[in-house]
C-alpha cells in the first residue's frame, strides 16, 4: 500500500476533519457542517417572552389575496404581539395615499423602488409583519427584513388567489406587464417569493385564515427546533452506552458519513412527514420541480439546507438535464398498466433522478477543510450516473470531491461498461473488478468499516471516504419524489381520482427503488400493493414468500437485466427495521447472522406483516425476451430487460382491479444485444454504437436517447483500470487515485 509523509499542518487539518464527522458535538456553534453556520449567520434565537418570536419577527409573504393581513392579525392575537401590515401601517402612512394610488401615480418600476426604500426604514421586533405582495421584488428591503425575522411564505393555490382578487375587483397587480394575464403575472412573482422564504405554509384550497395561522405556528416551531429531525442507524439500540457511542445524526452528517459507524443504515428517528389530501391535490397540476421542492422541504430541515438553497439545487438538477420536460412522465401501455419512464436523464437510467441532485446536496453538506472520495459499487447504471452527476459540480467543489466507481468487469452489459468508462471525468474514475456486484458492494462496506484505513486516509491525505450508493440517505430521498409524482400524473391525466389506490411494480435488486415507493405511501400516496419483480437471482422474491433470506448455495447468475443481478440487498434492512417497529437489536442480530452464516429468518408475524403490502415473483430469461417482443409487436413500445422483468411479474401478480405503475428503470438502448435478440434482429455482431443506431432506425417508442449515443463516442478515447477481487487491492487503487487528484494537485 502506498504511503506519503505529509506536512504537519495537513495532518492537523485532516484530524480535525475526521473528528468533525465521527464525534457528536453538543453545541450548534461547534458543528462544522452548514447546519451550524446557517443557524449562526441567521442569528435566529427564539427564546424570549413570546414562546415563538422572542425579539424576532414573523414575516408573512405571499401574493395579493393570500390572506397575509388576516392571518397576521390572528397570529398577533395568538402570540400576544404587535401586528404590522406593510400596506396600511407603513406605506400609506409614509405616502399619505393608498398603495394603488401610488402605483397609478408613479408606475411599476418607481413604485417598487419607493416601496423598498420605505420598508428599509421599518424597525420592529417581536412582531408579526404582513408584507405587501410586491415587497419581495426589492432585494435590499428583503435582506433588511430577513436579518430580524423568519420569512414565512403563504403558498396559496392560484385558483384561490384569482377568485379572491376577482371578488375584491382587482385585475392587476404590481409588476404585471401590459398584455400579461393575471394568472401569468402571479406565476411570475412566485419566482421572487421562492428566493426569500425560510419556511413555507402549503395552504389547502379553501383553507380558512384560522387554519393557515395554525400552520404558520407549526412551521415556525419546526424551523426553530433544530434538534427535532435526526437520523439513527437501523442497528441503533436504546441503551445509555450505545447512545453515547452512536449518537443521533443530523441530515448533514448522515449525508456526509453515508454509512452508520455500527454498520447499519441511516433512517429518520421520527416518523416520515405526511401531506394531507388537500396538499396532495395542490400538487396535481404542478411541475416535477415544484413537486420535488415541496416534498423534499418536508424531509430536509431548513437548518441543514435552507429552502431557497434547496430550490436552487432542484432547479439545477432537473431544469435542463432531462430530455423530457416532465422529467419522469407516465405513459399508458395497455389495459390497466402504465409505464413510469425514468430514463430521460443524461445516462438513461432511473439513477439520474437521484444522482443529478445528490452531488449538490453532498457538496453543500460537507465541512470545510477536507477532501472527500465517493466510493461506489455499481451493478451497471449507478456508476455512470454517479460519475456524470459529480462532474456537474462547480470547479471548487470538484477540487474537493472525487469519485471512484468499482464495477464487475464481466457483470455489466457491453454498453453499460462503455458508458461507465465514457463517463469518467477529471474528478471521477472507473475500475473494473474481476468479480460480481456483491463482492464490490461488500468490499466497499468493509473499506468503510476499516477504521485503520479510513483514519490513515484522513491523517495522511486530509481525505474522508463517503458513499453515493442507495445506502446513502441523500441517494434514496429523491426517489420518493418520482413515485409520488407518478401517482399525481395518473390523477392529472384523469385515469384516476385522488384517493384511488394503485399498485406499483418495480424490478428489484438492492431494494432502494421499491423502498422509496414505501416512503411515498408513508407520506400519503395511496399505494395498495408493492410488486417486487426479480430475475433469476430471486433471493428477494423467495424472502418475501418465505421470510427466509438465504444466500447459501446461491451463485449469482448473469442475466439480460444486470442491474438487478444482486444477492445482498442493502436497503431491505431499512424496510425490515420499519416492520420490526424500529428494533435495532434485531437488525444487528439478523445482519450479523447473514454475514457469518449467509442466511437469516424472520418470525412468522413479520412475514405476515410484510405480505400484507408486498407480493413478489421472478422472471426467466425466456419470459423476459418474450415480453419485449410481444409488447413491441402490440404497441410499438420497446421495454428494456429490467422493465420487461417487471412487466412479466405484473402480469402474473396483479389482479387488474386497479392501475399498476411499472417502473421503467432504463432506456432500452443500453441493452441493445438483448433487445435485438428479442426482436429477432440478426445483425448481432456489430459494435455497440452500430447496434444503437440500428435500433434508433426502428422509430419505436420511447424515442432514441441522444446523450447515450454521444457517450459511446467518448468511450473510445478513455482508458480504465482492472483489478483482482481483493479488498486490499481496491484500497490501494483508491489511495493511488487520492494521491493523483488531491495530493499532487496541492503540491
Swiss-Prot record:
The keyword Zinc does not apply. Its cofactor is pyridoxal 5'-phosphate. The modification N6-(pyridoxal phosphate)lysine is found at residue 351. InterPro entries: P-loop_NTPase, Shikimate/glucono_kinase, Shikimate_kinase/TSH1, Thr_synth_N, Thr_synth_N_sf, Thr_synthase-like, TrpB-like_PALP_sf. Keywords: Pyridoxal phosphate. Gene3D superfamilies: 3.40.50.1100, P-loop containing nucleotide triphosphate hydrolases, Threonine synthase, N-terminal domain. This is Threonine synthase-like 1. The gene is Thnsl1.
Amino acid at each position: 500500500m502506498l504511503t506519503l509523509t505529509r506536512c504537519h499542518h495537513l495532518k492537523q487539518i485532516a484530524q480535525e476533519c475526521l473528528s468533525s464527522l465521527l464525534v457528536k458535538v453538543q453545541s450548534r456553534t461547534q458543528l462544522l457542517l452548514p447546519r451550524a453556520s446557517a443557524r449562526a449567520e441567521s442569528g435566529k434565537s427564539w427564546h424570549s417572552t413570546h414562546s415563538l418570536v422572542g425579539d424576532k419577527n414573523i414575516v408573512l409573504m405571499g401574493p395579493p389575496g393570500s390572506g397575509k393581513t388576516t392571518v397576521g392579525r390572528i397570529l398577533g392575537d395568538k402570540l400576544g404581539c404587535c401586528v404590522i401590515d406593510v400596506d396600511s401601517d407603513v406605506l400609506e402612512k409614509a405616502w399619505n395615499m393608498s398603495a394603488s394610488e401610488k402605483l397609478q401615480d408613479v408606475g411599476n418600476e418607481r413604485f417598487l423602488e419607493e416601496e423598498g426604500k420605505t420598508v428599509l426604514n421599518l424597525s420592529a421586533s417581536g412582531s408579526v409583519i404582513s408584507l405587501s405582495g410586491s415587497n419581495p421584488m426589492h432585494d435590499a428591503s428583503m435582506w433588511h427584513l430577513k436579518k430580524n425575522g423568519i420569512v414565512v411564505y403563504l403558498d396559496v393555490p392560484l385558483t384561490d388567489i384569482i377568485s379572491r382578487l376577482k371578488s375584491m375587483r382587482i385585475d392587476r397587480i404590481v409588476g404585471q406587464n401590459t398584455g400579461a394575464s393575471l394568472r401569468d403575472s402571479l406565476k411570475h412573482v412566485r419566482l421572487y417569493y421562492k428566493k426569500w422564504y425560510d419556511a413555507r405554509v402549503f395552504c389547502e384550497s379553501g383553507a380558512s385564515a384560522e387554519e393557515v395561522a395554525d400552520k404558520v405556528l407549526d412551521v415556525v416551531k419546526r424551523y426553530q427546533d433544530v434538534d427535532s429531525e435526526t437520523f439513527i442507524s437501523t442497528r441503533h439500540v436504546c441503551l445509555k452506552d450505545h447512545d453515547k457511542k452512536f449518537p443521533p445524526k443530523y441530515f448533514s452528517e448522515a449525508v456526509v458519513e453515508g454509512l452508520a459507524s455500527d454498520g447499519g443504515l441511516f433512517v429518520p428517528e421520527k416518523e416520515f412527514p405526511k401531506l394531507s389530501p388537500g396538499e396532495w391535490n395542490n400538487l396535481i397540476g404542478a411541475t416535477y420541480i415544484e413537486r420535488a421542492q415541496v416534498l423534499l422541504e418536508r424531509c430536509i430541515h431548513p437548518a441543514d439546507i435552507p429552502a431557497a438553497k434547496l430550490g436552487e439545487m432542484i432547479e439545477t438538477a432537473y431544469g435542463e438535464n432531462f430530455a423530457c420536460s416532465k422529467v419522469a412522465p407516465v405513459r399508458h401501455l395497455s389495459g390497466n398498466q402504465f409505464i413510469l419512464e425514468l430514463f430521460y436523464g443524461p445516462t438513461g437510467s432511473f439513477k439520474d433522478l437521484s444522482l443529478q441532485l445528490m452531488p449538490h446536496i453532498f457538496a453543500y453538506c460537507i465541512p470545510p477543510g477536507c477532501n472527500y472520495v465517493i466510493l461506489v459499487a455499481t451493478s451497471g447504471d449507478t456508476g455512470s450516473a454517479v460519475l456524470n452527476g459529480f462532474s456537474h459540480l462547480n470547479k471548487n467543489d470538484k477540487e474537493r470531491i472525487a469519485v471512484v466507481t468499482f464495477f464487475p468487469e464481466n457483470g455489466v452489459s457491453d454498453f453499460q461498461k462503455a458508458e461507465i468508462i465514457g463517463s469518467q471525468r477529471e474528478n471521477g474514475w472507473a475500475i473494473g473488478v474481476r468479480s460480481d456486484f456483491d463482492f464490490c458492494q461488500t468490499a466497499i462496506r468493509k473499506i468503510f468499516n476499516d477504521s485503520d484505513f479510513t483514519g490513515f486516509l484522513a491523517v495522511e491525505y486530509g481525505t474522508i471516504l463517503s458513499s453515493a450508493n442507495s445506502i446513502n440517505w441523500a441517494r434514496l430521498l429523491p426517489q420518493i419524489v418520482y413515485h409520488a409524482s407518478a401517482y399525481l400524473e395518473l390523477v392529472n391525466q384523469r385515469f384516476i381520482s385522488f384517493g384511488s389506490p394503485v399498485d406499483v411494480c418495480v424490478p428489484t435488486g438492492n431494494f432502494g427503488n421499491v423502498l422509496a415507493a414505501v416512503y411515498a405511501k408513508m407520506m400519503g400516496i395511496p399505494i395498495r400493493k408493492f410488486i417486487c419483480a426479480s430475475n433469476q437471482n430471486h433471493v428477494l422474491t423467495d424472502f418475501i414468500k418465505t421470510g427466509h433470506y438465504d444466500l447459501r448455495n446461491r451463485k449469482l447468475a448473469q442475466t439480460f437485466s444486470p442491474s438487478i443481478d444482486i444477492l445482498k440487498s442493502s436497503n431491505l434492512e431499512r424496510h425490515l427495521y420499519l416492520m420490526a417497529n424500529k428494533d435495532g437489536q434485531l437488525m444487528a442480530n439478523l445482519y450479523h447472522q447473514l454475514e457469518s452464516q449467509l442466511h437469516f429468518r424472520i418470525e412468522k408475524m413479520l412475514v405476515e406483516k410484510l405480505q400484507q403490502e408486498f407480493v413478489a415473483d421472478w422472471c426467466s430469461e425466456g419470459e423476459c425476451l418474450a415480453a419485449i417482443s410481444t409488447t413491441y409487436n402490440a404497441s410499438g413500445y420497446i421495454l428494456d430487460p429490467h422493465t420487461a422483468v417487471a412487466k412479466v411479474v405484473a402480469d402474473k401478480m396483479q389482479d387488474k382491479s386497479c392501475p399498476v405503475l411499472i417502473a421503467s428503470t432504463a432506456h432500452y438502448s443500453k441493452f441493445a444485444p438483448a433487445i435485438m435478440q428479442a426482436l429477432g434482429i440478426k445483425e448481432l455482431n456489430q459494435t455497440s454504437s452500430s447496434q444503437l443506431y440500428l435500433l434508433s432506425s426502428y422509430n419505436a417508442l420511447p424515442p432514441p436517447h441522444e446523450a447515450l449515443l454521444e457517450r459511446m463516442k467518448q468511450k473510445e478515447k478513455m482508458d480504465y483500470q482492472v483489478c483482482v477481487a481483493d479488498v486490499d487491492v481496491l484500497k490501494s487503487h483508491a489511495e493511488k487515485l487520492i494521491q493523483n487528484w488531491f495530493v499532487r494537485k496541492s503540491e
